[in-house]
């Protein structure tokens, strides 16, 4: 291992080793190479510097590396390997997400270096001589290609690189095969949040640096700055606007406005690329295709990340920063690092220069290892100022060498596309398509897709990535009219390139309209985002009763939104695109209708069930008419009331006319509630009279009920009634007459059936609703007998008695006395029979529904209970026999003997 006179040069050597090998050597081999060539002391120092530099980025996972720094391993070789692995990992992480740290640090303008220019031209004469004496392997050249001598004038370094503090991450990141930089000190800027801004710490807290001479090691940054007069003269003569004089000034620079500092563009414009940009692009393409998949991920690579600045990109010269660019920094920041939007902004400004080579594309930050066209570049090229259309021509000319990867089948960016229902959706790059070839390529890619998937699923859209693509779509359309497309005549002309581009743009508009609608609907609490696609239409309804939910209204809103969007688009588009849009709209409506057909079957089933329930009410009333003449008039009255009831309303679930007399759990409206509840109460009072019948009659009624269900051919949907407002007065009279007649007949029968009159003949609406709510029955009658007798369900048995004894409130003194007297005469069996025969209770309709496993479980528990009971009885008998024998027989025998 070569001995180096400077730590800074030594670290440059290590970083050069990393940069030259990480694209061609695997991760394990790179770690082994570092362990074999460098000492643990230097590796540990570099690891510490990399860690503190990476900590400037808030997206850096510092906790993963912090514990390892404190770890003390006995084996030096394993410790060396661990440190080398951390260096390689952090080096690539910093290369990927170093943009945040670059934005936060104060920087001055730096001139660009070409590939054939050495970093040593900025070195002082003394250092150059030292270096030449120790290591003859490096040829030190100045900017004009001459050898550097001791007596070189200071003006030779005027165009050299300025002073860069090693706290700058560019010092650690910017070293590539051909570009190297040096520094005089290494400040630990991570100590910033630990001290108050009023009383800064002494400079000794920042004494981690690389001295110019190992023998004369200075202790402060001040000494390191002034250790060599040649270096000082270089800084003074260069006219550097930002010169560090003390730690206090270095602290205070962070309180100033960073936006007024000069920005930079992280790419290298070499002499070869400047002379022939196309060849430079081909070189970059060959480099990218030759990258092996063995090392981490290709997303870690930022080729030619340059620490030097371009003064043409200063925000002082261009104040037109968009407000949401700072928001893009936050939205694009992920666990693996931000997407360096500030670099994209500077690239966007420099791309307007005619004939200038654009920036190297930023890699995709996805974890996908496949190569593909750059999403970031297409995103930032999609926003073009209105007054810069002439500059787009040069951008399109220089973009062509990035397109050769798109013609290969392996170049599809699978990180930005998904599959759903067997058909591929549109590429994510179509959301943020830029001008030029990319837009035409995206249009062709869109045209190749099947027409069966015209909508772009909203789950594939990232709101942060789509910023700024909608507002400039008209300007991006105009770009294709320029004659710069003659550059691409080697490709066959597209037949529908214009219409395809507009289709893609319209789809972008649909996405943004969908997002706006979603924000409005979410504030209202109506729409569930997973049910809707980008056109605002229903993608899938998972509920069978979707029509009764608030989504029914949003379906209509979505359909009308589709029609309005298509109508507005048809005013702008050509006839061919209008036809295509109409075809897609018809197909989409057909898909929606097919999805809604499944709901129509559910509607039919519900309507049939309700019609059979209505017929069941009528069938149950027939035995009462034939059996008891005293109830005949009342039943007839109820039937006439039911047939002539004017209260018909539109059912929310089925969309058909429906009587209110059905159970109000299905449909209950405020306007029709009072009349229907009266009729329902009259029906209930009739059903309570059947409690004195035997269980055989109940079984026969059940059989007749089942027969009526199976034999009723009439569809409920064919039943319709007309509403007449003039009959309301007559119906009220009928109700009052029915109540009086029912009260008289009940008074006559009270002496024979005293326990039957416990229910009031005037049930008000409130009490009826209270009974419906507070009298739930969870088990059918076939199971309730087991439940009431089982010791495992004592709580249910108690609540069953409580529910059975709860009756309607009494509104007069007579009813109160009568009900209080009748309650004591009721038995549990009568209550159970009454509840099972009451159609207002759930168990009336759940009578024949049971679970065989539940019955077998109850039978098993009952058998165990009986067995335990028999064992107890046997034990008691045995104990009694033993007691008798011991107490009576034994004394008698002893007395006789």
Curated annotation (Swiss-Prot):
<feature type="transmembrane region" description="Helical">
    <location>
        <begin position="873"/>
        <end position="893"/>
    </location>
</feature>
<keyword id="KW-1003">Cell membrane</keyword>
<dbReference type="GO" id="GO:0010977">
    <property type="term" value="P:negative regulation of neuron projection development"/>
</dbReference>
<feature type="compositionally biased region" description="Polar residues">
    <location>
        <begin position="452"/>
        <end position="471"/>
    </location>
</feature>
<dbReference type="InterPro" id="IPR039706">
    <property type="entry name" value="MINAR1-like"/>
</dbReference>
<keyword id="KW-0472">Membrane</keyword>
<feature type="region of interest" description="Disordered">
    <location>
        <begin position="688"/>
        <end position="766"/>
    </location>
</feature>
<comment type="similarity">
    <text>Belongs to the MINAR family.</text>
</comment>
<dbReference type="GO" id="GO:0031397">
    <property type="term" value="P:negative regulation of protein ubiquitination"/>
</dbReference>
<keyword id="KW-0812">Transmembrane</keyword>
<feature type="compositionally biased region" description="Basic and acidic residues">
    <location>
        <begin position="725"/>
        <end position="756"/>
    </location>
</feature>
<dbReference type="Pfam" id="PF22948">
    <property type="entry name" value="MINAR1_N"/>
</dbReference>
<feature type="region of interest" description="Disordered">
    <location>
        <begin position="405"/>
        <end position="433"/>
    </location>
</feature>
<keyword id="KW-1133">Transmembrane helix</keyword>
<feature type="topological domain" description="Cytoplasmic">
    <location>
        <begin position="1"/>
        <end position="872"/>
    </location>
</feature>
<dbReference type="InterPro" id="IPR055117">
    <property type="entry name" value="MINAR1_N"/>
</dbReference>
<feature type="compositionally biased region" description="Basic and acidic residues">
    <location>
        <begin position="472"/>
        <end position="498"/>
    </location>
</feature>
<feature type="compositionally biased region" description="Polar residues">
    <location>
        <begin position="697"/>
        <end position="724"/>
    </location>
</feature>
<dbReference type="GO" id="GO:0008285">
    <property type="term" value="P:negative regulation of cell population proliferation"/>
</dbReference>
<dbReference type="GO" id="GO:0030308">
    <property type="term" value="P:negative regulation of cell growth"/>
</dbReference>
<dbReference type="GO" id="GO:0032007">
    <property type="term" value="P:negative regulation of TOR signaling"/>
</dbReference>
<dbReference type="Pfam" id="PF06789">
    <property type="entry name" value="MINAR1_C"/>
</dbReference>
<feature type="topological domain" description="Extracellular">
    <location>
        <begin position="894"/>
        <end position="897"/>
    </location>
</feature>
<feature type="compositionally biased region" description="Polar residues">
    <location>
        <begin position="411"/>
        <end position="423"/>
    </location>
</feature>
<comment type="function">
    <text>Intrinsically disordered protein which may negatively regulate mTOR signaling pathway by stabilizing the mTOR complex component DEPTOR. Negatively regulates angiogenesis. Negatively regulates cell growth. May play a role in neuronal development.</text>
</comment>
<dbReference type="GO" id="GO:0005886">
    <property type="term" value="C:plasma membrane"/>
</dbReference>
<feature type="region of interest" description="Disordered">
    <location>
        <begin position="450"/>
        <end position="502"/>
    </location>
</feature>
<protein>
    <recommendedName>
        <fullName>Major intrinsically disordered Notch2-binding receptor 1</fullName>
    </recommendedName>
</protein>
<dbReference type="InterPro" id="IPR009626">
    <property type="entry name" value="MINAR1-like_C"/>
</dbReference>
């Amino acid at each position: 291992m070569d001995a180096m006179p400077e730590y800074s040069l030594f670290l440059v050597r290590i970083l050069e080793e990393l940069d030259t090998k990480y694209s061609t050597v695997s991760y394990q081999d790179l770690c082994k190479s570092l362990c074999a060539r460098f000492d643990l002391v230097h590796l540990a120092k570099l690891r510490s510097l990399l860690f503190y530099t990476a900590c400037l980025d808030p997206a850096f996972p510092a906790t993963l590396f912090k514990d390892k720094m404190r770890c003390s391993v006995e084996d030096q070789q394993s410790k060396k390997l661990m440190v080398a692995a951390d260096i390689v990992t952090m080096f690539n992480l910093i290369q990927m997400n170093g943009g945040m740290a670059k934005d936060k640090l104060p920087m001055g303008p730096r001139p660009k270096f070409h590939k054939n220019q050495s970093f040593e031209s900025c070195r002082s004469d003394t250092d150059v001589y030292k270096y030449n004496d120790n290591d003859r392997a490096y040829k030190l050249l100045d900017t004009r290609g001459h050898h550097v001598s001791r007596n070189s004038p200071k003006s030779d370094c005027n165009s050299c690189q300025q002073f860069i503090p090693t706290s700058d991450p560019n010092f650690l990141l910017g070293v590539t095969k051909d570009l190297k930089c040096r520094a005089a000190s290494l400040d630990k800027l991570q100590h910033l949040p630990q001290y108050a801004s009023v009383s800064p710490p002494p400079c000794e807290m920042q004494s981690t640096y690389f001295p110019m001479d190992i023998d004369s090691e200075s202790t402060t940054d001040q000494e390191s700055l002034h250790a060599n007069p040649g270096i000082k003269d270089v800084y003074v003569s260069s006219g550097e606007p930002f010169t560090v004089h003390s730690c206090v000034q270095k602290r205070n620079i962070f309180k100033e406005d960073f936006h007024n500092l000069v920005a930079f563009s992280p790419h290298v414009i070499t002499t070869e690329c400047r002379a022939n940009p196309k060849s430079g692009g081909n070189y970059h393409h060959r480099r990218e295709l030759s990258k092996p998949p063995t090392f981490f991920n290709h997303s870690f690579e930022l080729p030619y990340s340059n620490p030097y600045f371009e003064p043409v990109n200063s925000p002082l010269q261009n104040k037109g920063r968009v407000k949401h660019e700072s928001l893009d920094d936050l939205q694009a920041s992920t666990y693996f690092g931000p997407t360096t939007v500030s670099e994209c902004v500077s690239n966007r400004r420099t791309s307007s220069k005619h004939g200038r080579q654009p920036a190297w594309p930023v890699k995709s930050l996805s974890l996908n290892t496949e190569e593909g066209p750059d999403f970031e570049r297409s995103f930032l090229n999609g926003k073009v100022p209105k007054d810069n259309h002439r500059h787009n021509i040069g951008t399109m000319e220089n973009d062509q060498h990035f397109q050769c990867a798109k013609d290969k089948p392996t170049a599809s960016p699978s990180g930005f596309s998904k599959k759903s229902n067997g058909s591929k959706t549109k590429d994510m790059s179509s959301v943020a398509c830029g001008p030029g070839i990319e837009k035409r390529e995206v249009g062709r890619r869109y045209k190749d897709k099947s027409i069966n998937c015209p909508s772009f699923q909203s789950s594939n859209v990232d709101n942060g990535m789509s910023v700024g693509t909608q507002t400039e779509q008209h300007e991006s359309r105009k770009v294709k009219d320029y004659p710069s497309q003659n550059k691409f005549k080697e490709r066959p002309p597209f037949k529908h390139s214009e219409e395809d581009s507009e289709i893609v743009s319209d789809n972008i508009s649909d996405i943004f309209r969908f997002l706006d609608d979603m924000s409005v609907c979410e504030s209202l609490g109506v729409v569930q985002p997973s049910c809707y696609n980008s056109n605002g239409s229903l993608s899938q309804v998972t509920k069978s009763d979707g029509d009764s939910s608030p989504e029914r209204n949003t379906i209509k809103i979505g359909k009308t939104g589709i029609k309005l969007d298509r109508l507005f688009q048809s005013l702008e588009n050509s006839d061919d695109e209008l036809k295509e849009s109409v075809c897609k709209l018809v197909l989409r409506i057909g898909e929606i209708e097919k999805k809604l057909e499944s709901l129509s079957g559910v509607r039919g089933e519900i309507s049939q069930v309700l019609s059979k329930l209505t017929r069941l009410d009528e069938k149950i009333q027939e035995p009462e008419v034939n059996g008891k003449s005293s109830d005949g008039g009342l039943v007839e009255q109820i039937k006439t009331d039911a047939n002539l009831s004017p209260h018909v309303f539109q059912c929310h679930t089925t969309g058909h006319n429906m009587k209110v007399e059905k159970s109000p759990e299905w449909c209950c409206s405020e306007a029709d509630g009072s009349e229907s509840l009266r009729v329902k109460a009259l029906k209930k009072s009739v059903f309570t009279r059947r409690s004195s019948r035997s269980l055989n009659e109940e079984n026969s009624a059940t059989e007749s009920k089942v027969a009526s269900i199976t034999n009723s051919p009439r569809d409920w949907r064919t039943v319709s009634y007309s509403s007449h407002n003039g009959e309301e007065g007559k119906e009220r009279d009928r109700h009052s007459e029915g109540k009086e007649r029912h009260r008289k007949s009940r008074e006559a029968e009270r002496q024979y059936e005293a326990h039957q009159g416990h229910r009031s003949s005037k049930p008000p609406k409130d009490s009826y609703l209270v009974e419906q709510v507070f009298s739930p029955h969870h088990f059918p009658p076939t199971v309730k007998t087991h439940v009431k007798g089982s010791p495992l369900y004592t709580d249910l048995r108690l609540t069953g008695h409580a529910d059975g004894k709860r009756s309607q409130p009494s509104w007069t003194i007579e009813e109160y006395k009568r009900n209080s007297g009748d309650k004591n005469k009721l038995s549990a069996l009568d209550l159970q029979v009454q509840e099972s025969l009451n159609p207002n209770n759930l168990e009336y309709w759940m009578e024949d529904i049971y679970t065989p496993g539940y019955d077998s479980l109850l039978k098993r528990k009952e058998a165990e209970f009986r067995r335990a009971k028999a064992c107890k009885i046997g034990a008691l008998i045995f104990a009694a026999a033993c007691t008798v024998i011991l107490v009576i027989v034994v004394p008698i025998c002893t007395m006789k003997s």
